[in-house]
Amino acid sequence: LALVAHLATLRASVPFLHFFDGFRTSHEVSKIEMIDYEDIKKIVDVKDIENFKKRALNPEHPQLNGTAQNPDIYFQGREAGNKYYDAVPEIVEEMMKKVEGITGRKYNLFDYYGAKDAEKVIVIMGSGAEAIEETIAKMNKEGHKVGVLKVRLYRPFSAKAFVKALP
C-alpha cells in the first residue's frame, strides 16, 4: 500500500500519511515481495511528478504561503481546498487498480471478509486485521454470522464506499 499512497499523493496534491503499526508488524518474520522498479515506472505518471516539483519551494520562483488571516478569509481558503480532498477516494481506488495490475494484489478502500449474511461486523484498520480475519474464519465455521471490514483509507473517509463494502 506504500506505492498506492505515493502515487495517490502525487495525483491528488494532498499529503498522505502511510504507516505500519503495532507489535506484530515490528516483531514478526514475514516474507515480502518487492515490486520491480521497471514495473513501477510503468504506472507512475511523469506529469504528476512534474506538477509536484513545480509546487516545491524554489528561490527562482518565490511564492507566499502561510499568511496571517482573519477567520473569515482563512475559512474560505480551507473551503477552496475541499475539491482536492473530495477527489481523494476515487484517486486512491484508481491507484489501487494500477498497483493490482502489476502485482496482482487487490485492495479496495474497504475490504470485507466473512459471512454474506453477517449479523455482526468488526471494523478495523492496521496490523490486527489479519488476526481478526483468522478468527472470523473460525467463527463462521462454527456457525456464527460474523465478518470483518478492513479500512484501507481513513481520511478522507468515504461513507459511500464503507456502506457499499458491507454485506
Q: For each predicted feature, which ranges?
A:
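Internal, well-ordered domain-core segments that constitute the primary functional module
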Residues: L1-G22
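A generic local secondary-structure boundary/capping motif
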Residues: V4-A8, K31, Y112
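Short, low-complexity, polar/charged sequence segments that are solvent-exposed and flexible
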Residues: L7-R11, I35-D39, K141-G143, L166-P167
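Thiamine diphosphate
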Residues: M96-P167
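Conformationally flexible catalytic loops at phosphate/diphosphate-handling active centers
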Residues: F16-D111
